[in-house]
Design a protein with these regions (language model features):
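Acidic, metal-coordinating catalytic segment for phosphate/diphosphate chemistry
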Residues: 100, 105-211
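DNA-contacting surface of Y-family translesion DNA polymerases
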Residues: 2-128
Length: 211
């Protein structure tokens, strides 16, 4: 099934054929065009990579993309997270157990902040090895209105970042996730554009508004 032409499966079995092809290839892609309503106490995204990723910079690109994807879902749910976790699965040739790590954070749904948390966990745990699967999860939610402001915080800068994030979300909601991409989306290791072109109406898990 994994080696079948997905277009033939689609023409023969419809959407069910495409779903079978995705599952056979270890890909879990959910259509999230509709506003997300969380049913669980965690939001996450995982993907099986199309090849082994051995360079740290390439893995970082994937981690950044997934951190952003789940951050979008978090804002759609009008929540902030207080716990960030990651998981890295290695290639069969590595004969190694997967790596897991998590950390407690100040309540946030800011993309850049969450990317930094995810990369911090990655740098603490990963030393070497061919990575074949990646997962990013956020949990322990509070309402998006909840937050801490200290005397040392630049309130004006925080509000500026929130307005910018809101503007980016609005553009993507209107024109699709790929209407605004980071520069590293042009690199070979990136998966954002490739996943946006998946057939059968599937969109990259966590990419609200992806077209």
């Amino acid at each position: 099934m994994a080696n079948f032409n997905p277009d033939i499966l689609k023409s023969s079995l419809g959407v069910a054929g495409v779903d079978l092809w995705f599952h056979a290839n270890g890909i879990d892609e959910s259509n999230v065009h509709k506003p997300y309503k969380p049913k669980s106490k965690a939001l996450g995204n995982s993907q099986v990579l199309p090849r082994d990723y051995t360079k740290q910079r390439d893995i970082e690109i994937i981690m950044r993309e997934m951190a952003e994807q789940v951050a979008i879902r978090l804002r759609r749910a009008h929540k902030k997270t207080m716990c960030v976790s990651i998981s890295l699965g290695f290639s069969k040739s590595e004969n190694r157990r997967s790596l897991q790590a998590q950390m407690t954070v100040e309540p946030t749904n800011n993309t850049d902040t969450l990317i930094n948390h995810v990369l911090e966990l990655f740098h603490k745990k990963y030393t070497s090895g061919a990575v074949r699967s990646v997962a990013v999860n956020y949990s322990k939610f509070v309402d998006e209105s909840f937050g801490f402001i200290s005397l040392f915080d630049d309130v004006e800068q925080i509000e500026k970042e929130e307005r910018l994030q809101s503007a980016i979300d609005n553009i993507r909601n209107e024109f699709g996730f790929t209407s605004l991409l980071r520069a590293n989306a042009l690199e070979e290791a990136s998966r954002s554009r490739a996943r946006s072109k998946l057939i059968g109406g599937h969109s990259a898990g966590g990419l609200d508004g992806l077209r």
